[in-house]
Amino acid sequence: MAGCCSVLGSFLFEYDTPRIVLIRSRKVGLMNRAVQLLILAYVIGWVFVWEKGYQETDSVVSSVTTKAKGVAVTNTSQLGFRIWDVADYVIPAQEENSLFIMTNMIVTVNQTQSTCPEIPDKTSICNSDADCTPGSVDTHSSGVATGRCVPFNESVKTCEVAAWCPVENDVGVPTPAFLKAAENFTLLVKNNIWYPKFNFSKRNILPNITTSYLKSCIYNAQTDPFCPIFRLGTIVEDAGHSFQEMAVEGGIMGIQIKWDCNLDRAASLCLPRYSFRRLDTRDLEHNVSPGYNFRFAKYYRDLAGKEQRTLTKAYGIRFDIIVFGKAGKFDIIPTMINVGSGLALLGVATVLCDVIVLYCMKKKYYYRDKKYKYVEDYEQGLSGEMNQ
C-alpha cells in the first residue's frame, strides 16, 4: 500500500522537463535553421497565402436558366421553303441546366399505321414469303412482320411490316447539316449563385450591365469576358472543335462557370469565369454510334379523320451548363488550427537535427552523453552516497 502511495505521490507532485543541450556546430546549426525556414515558407506561403488557410470555405449553390435566339431559312424538296425559329429547334423548350439545339434531321412525313416494306438490311431482305416469319419483331425492326415478301424497289424485296408507314430510312445522315446556320445562333445563360454559410448571393449578369449593353454584347474571352450571351459557334470553337462538323451528327458541349470568391475583398471582385469543353467522347478510331440524336413525332389527322404523324430524327448539340466554385472568408478557428499545425511542424527540425547529431556525426557518443542523463547511473550515485 505504501508503494502505491509513493508512486501516486511521484505522479502528482513531480514535474519532468526536457533537458536542453546547446551544441555549437555550424553544420547542425545551419541545417536546423534551413529546415525551420522551409517549414515557415510552407506554412506562410502555401497554407496561408496560396490555400488561404485563415478562411472558412463554402461550396456554391446554383440555379441556371437559358434562352436561345436565332432564325434560319431552309428550302428543300421534302419540306419546301421554311423558316426555323426558337420554337422549332429548341427541343424540349426547357431542361434543367441544359439546352438542346437541333442542327440536323431526318424527316419522314405523312406516316400512317398500315403495312409497307421494311428498310433493306441483312435480316429483312427476302426472295419469297418463306423467308419472312409472321409476327416476328426485333429491336431494329420498324414494325411487326406480316409474313409477306414484297418489293422495296425494282431490284430488292424485303419483308412486309405493320408499322407507321412509310418507315424511316436513316441510313445516310444529311451533310452538310440541315440547320448549319445555327452556328450564329446565340445563347443567354442566366446563373444565380448563393453561398449559404456566408449568406452571399450574386448572378452572372453583373450590376454594371445595362439593358442596352445586354442586347448588343457577345461573349469574347479577350474583349468581353463577362457578357452572358454566347454565340454557339464560338462555344464549340473555343473547345477546339468545328461547329459544322459537330452539327452533322450532334454532340454534347459543356459550358463551365467557375465562381471562386474571396469574400474578405469587395463583392464586386467576385466574378464568373467561363470555359468550354466537349463532353461526349470523339475518338476517330473507335467511332461507333457517334454524336447525339433522338426522335420525336408530331401527330395530326387528315381531311378524312385518319391519324397521321411526321417523324423527326433530330441531331443536335446539347449544351450542359456546369457551375462550380467556392468562397472563403476569414474565421478565427481555421486560422488558429493552421497556426498550431505550423508550430507543431517546427518540431520536425529538432527531431531531424537530433537524429543527425546522435546517430550520424563522428562525436555522436559524446553528444549522447551530454544529451541523456541515464536513470541507472543516477540511482547508483544515490546508493553510493547513502552507503558512505
Curated annotation (Swiss-Prot):
Widespread distribution in the brain. Strongly expressed in microglial cells. Also expressed in epithelial cells. Induction: By nerve injury. Residues 1-33, 360-388 are cytoplasmic. It comes from the Eukaryota. One of its GO terms (biological process) is inorganic cation transmembrane transport. Pfam families: P2X_receptor (PF00864). GO terms for cellular component: apical part of cell; axon; cell body; cell junction; dendrite; dendritic spine; glutamatergic synapse; lysosomal membrane. Changing residue 186 to S: Does not affect ATP- and CTP-evoked current. Reduced ATP affinity. Does not affect CTP affinity. Its main location: membrane. GO terms for molecular function: ATP binding; ATP-gated ion channel activity; cadherin binding; copper ion binding; extracellularly ATP-gated monoatomic cation channel activity; identical protein binding; ligand-gated calcium channel activity; ligand-gated monoatomic cation channel activity. Activated by ATP. pH-dependent and inhibited by acidic pH. Residues 55-338 are extracellular. ATP binds at residues 67, 69, 186, 188, 293, 295, 313. Disulfide bonds join 116-165, 126-149, 132-159, 217-227, 261-270. The keyword Metal-binding does not apply. The chain crosses the membrane at residues 34-54, 339-359. Belongs to the P2X receptor family. ATP-gated nonselective transmembrane cation channel permeable to potassium, sodium and calcium. CTP, but not GTP or UTP, functions as a weak affinity agonist for P2RX4. Activated by extracellularly released ATP, it plays multiple role in immunity and central nervous system physiology. Plays a key role in initial steps of T-cell activation and Ca(2+) microdomain formation. Also participates in basal T-cell activity without TCR/CD3 stimulation. Promotes the differentiation and activation of Th17 cells via expression of retinoic acid-related orphan receptor C/RORC. This is P2X purinoceptor 4. The gene is P2rx4.
